């Protein structure tokens, strides 16, 4: 039986921290699905879902046993459809843990058979978030060491002044 993990997020945009989690999750699961959320009730993404999928697909094209798919609605419904055994989440700090623990409990309540696997980022990415990347790029700072080259270029174009 193939053990499939799902790494969900908006990935707006994907960062080197996300890539770190993806590569490490692939060591645990037979297959990993990067599940790109179509939309979020929290905020409007700066990149379309198609752009976000493209960025992820391009930066992970050399990784085996990885799929990039879009989902909309409840994550647990996507998990059931894909017959996945676990949700993969990155934890940077205690504040992440509190929020992620609530999500894990809610997902477990909705689908009793799902597990959540928390992965700590490599130390160099422990501060990194998509929001931080967007803010730095918006104000003209360099995000070269924080995101893949395709994303850096897209951010520069998006925030040209």
UniProtKB/Swiss-Prot annotation:
CDD domains documented for this protein: PPAT (cd02163)
Cofactors: Mg(2+)
Matches recorded under InterPro entries: Cyt_trans-like (IPR004821), PPAT (IPR001980), Rossmann-like_a/b/a_fold (IPR014729)
Catalytic activity: (R)-4'-phosphopantetheine + ATP + H(+) = 3'-dephospho-CoA + diphosphate
UniProt-listed GO biological process terms: coenzyme A biosynthetic process
Keyword set includes Translocase: no
Keywords for the protein's UniProt record, in alphabetical order: ATP-binding, Coenzyme A biosynthesis, Cytoplasm, Magnesium, Nucleotide-binding, Nucleotidyltransferase, Transferase
Top class in the EC scheme: transferase
Keyword Amino-acid biosynthesis (UniProt): no
Major subcellular site: cytoplasm
GO molecular function, one term: ATP binding
Binding, ATP: 10-11, 18, 90-92, 100, 125-131
Localization per Swiss-Prot or TrEMBL: Cytoplasm
EC number: 2.7.7.3
Residues binding substrate: 10, 42, 75, 89
Recorded metabolic or biological pathway in which this protein acts: Cofactor biosynthesis; coenzyme A biosynthesis; CoA from (R)-pantothenate: step 4/5
One Gene Ontology term, aspect cellular component: cytoplasm
Site residues by UniProt (Transition state stabilizer): 18
Subunit composition and interactions: Homohexamer.
NCBIfam families attached to this UniProt entry: coaD_prev_kdtB, cyt_tran_rel
Functional description taken from the UniProt entry: Reversibly transfers an adenylyl group from ATP to 4'-phosphopantetheine, yielding dephospho-CoA (dPCoA) and pyrophosphate.
Membership in a protein family: Belongs to the bacterial CoaD family.
The protein, known as: Phosphopantetheine adenylyltransferase
Gene: coaD
């Amino acid at each position: 039986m193939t053990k499939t993990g799902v790494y969900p997020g908006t990935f707006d945009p994907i960062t080197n921290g996300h890539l770190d989690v993806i590569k490490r999750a692939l060591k645990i699961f037979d297959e990993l699905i990067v599940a790109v959320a179509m939309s979020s009730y929290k905020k409007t993404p700066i990149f379309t879902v198609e752009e976000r999928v493209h960025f992820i697909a391009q930066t992970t094209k050399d990784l085996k046993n990885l799929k990039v798919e879009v989902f909309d609605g409840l994550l647990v419904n996507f998990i059931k459809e894909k017959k996945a055994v676990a949700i993969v989440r990155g934890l940077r700090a205690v504040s992440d843990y509190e929020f992620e623990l609530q999500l894990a409990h809610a997902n477990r309540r909705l689908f009793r058979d799902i597990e959540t696997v928390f992965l700590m980022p490599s130390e160099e990415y422990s501060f990194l978030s998509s929001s931080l990347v967007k803010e730095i790029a918006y104000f003209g700072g360099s995000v070269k060491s924080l995101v893949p080259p395709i994303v850096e270029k897209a951010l520069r174009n998006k925030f040209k002044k």
